[in-house]
């Protein structure tokens, strides 16, 4: 079994750019950014429970990274960058820390490296279980209306929130709930030590208005790019800024 994805071919000899979306997104999420890099072959992946991979269920990060590796093999991707936002960034970091063959580097936008104590993990597990129950039982428009009121999305205006609620409500609530629980921060290990000892290039993007993830970025041994005029979802709020940063990264 492999994950559903959309492949766009570029010039031979350059590494692939493998894009991983955030929670409730799909393979279209990164395309405005990715299509600015037409020289590179691009793979836009649907993570389990989302888009064309909605019927694929997993028990945890090991399953997700295993499926990702099988997907890369199926497309004969031997040399690549992982580019991930939020949940996709966490998947990218988890996969990269397993020393993937052919990995050139990782670009993470607003991805959490992991909670650092049992109290934080217990609180996150309670919160994610509550959200998962709502995704399973309530209309998605109502759930996402509340989801985008969370502090991390404080930079969004009303029009942006309404647009995201409408877009994300096309998902399957049950499969979102299952993926939320399977890949909760409560079950993700703290990756800080692994990332400090890494052998791959590691870049971190965060919006200038995303104070939580700017603080997290400062804890990581990463080359950090702050995206102007953007909050947590920087590639949606300022795609040109993310394109400029990614272009700079790929020139090295």
From Swiss-Prot:
Family of the protein in this entry: Belongs to the AB hydrolase superfamily. MenH family.
Keywords: Lyase, Menaquinone biosynthesis
Enzymatic reactions: 5-enolpyruvoyl-6-hydroxy-2-succinyl-cyclohex-3-ene-1-carboxylate = (1R,6R)-6-hydroxy-2-succinyl-cyclohexa-2,4-diene-1-carboxylate + pyruvate
Protein name according to UniProt: 2-succinyl-6-hydroxy-2,4-cyclohexadiene-1-carboxylate synthase
Gene3D superfamilies per UniProt: alpha/beta hydrolase
First-level EC class: lyase
Domain of life the protein comes from: Bacteria
Organism: Escherichia coli O127:H6 (strain E2348/69 / EPEC)
Record-level GO BP terms: menaquinone biosynthetic process
EC number: 4.2.99.20
Subunit structure: Monomer.
Entry function: Catalyzes a proton abstraction reaction that results in 2,5-elimination of pyruvate from 2-succinyl-5-enolpyruvyl-6-hydroxy-3-cyclohexene-1-carboxylate (SEPHCHC) and the formation of 2-succinyl-6-hydroxy-2,4-cyclohexadiene-1-carboxylate (SHCHC).
Listed pathway(s): Quinol/quinone metabolism; 1,4-dihydroxy-2-naphthoate biosynthesis; 1,4-dihydroxy-2-naphthoate from chorismate: step 3/7; Quinol/quinone metabolism; menaquinone biosynthesis
Keyword Hydrolase: no
GO molecular function: 2-succinyl-6-hydroxy-2,4-cyclohexadiene-1-carboxylate synthase activity
Gene responsible for this protein: menH
């Amino acid at each position: 079994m492999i994950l559903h994805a959309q492949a766009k071919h570029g010039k031979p000899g350059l590494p692939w750019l493998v894009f991983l979306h955030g929670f409730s997104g799909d393979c279209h999420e990164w395309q405005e950014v990715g299509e600015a890099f037409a020289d590179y072959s691009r793979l836009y992946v649907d993570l389990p429970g989302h888009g064309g991979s909605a019927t694929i269920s997993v028990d945890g990060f090991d399953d997700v990274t295993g499926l990702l590796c099988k997907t890369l093999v199926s497309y004969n991707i031997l040399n690549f960058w992982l580019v991930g936002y939020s949940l996709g960034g966490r998947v990218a970091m988890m996969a990269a820390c397993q020393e993937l063959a052919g990995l050139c580097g990782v670009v993470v936008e607003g991805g959490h490296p992991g909670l650092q104590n049992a109290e934080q993990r217990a609180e996150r597990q309670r919160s994610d279980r509550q959200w998962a129950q709502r995704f399973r039982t309530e209309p998605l428009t109502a759930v996402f209306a509340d989801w985008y009121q969370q502090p991390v999305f404080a930079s969004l205006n009303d029009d942006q929130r309404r647009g995201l609620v409408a877009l994300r409500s096309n998902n399957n609530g049950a499969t979102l709930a299952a993926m939320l629980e399977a890949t909760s921060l409560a079950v993700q290990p703290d990756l800080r030590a692994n990332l400090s000892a890494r052998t791959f290039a590691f870049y971190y993007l965060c919006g200038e208005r995303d104070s939580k993830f700017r603080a997290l970025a400062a804890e990581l041994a990463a080359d950090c790019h702050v995206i102007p005029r953007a909050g947590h979802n920087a590639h949606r709020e300022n795609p040109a800024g993310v394109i400029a940063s990614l272009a700079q990264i790929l020139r090295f």
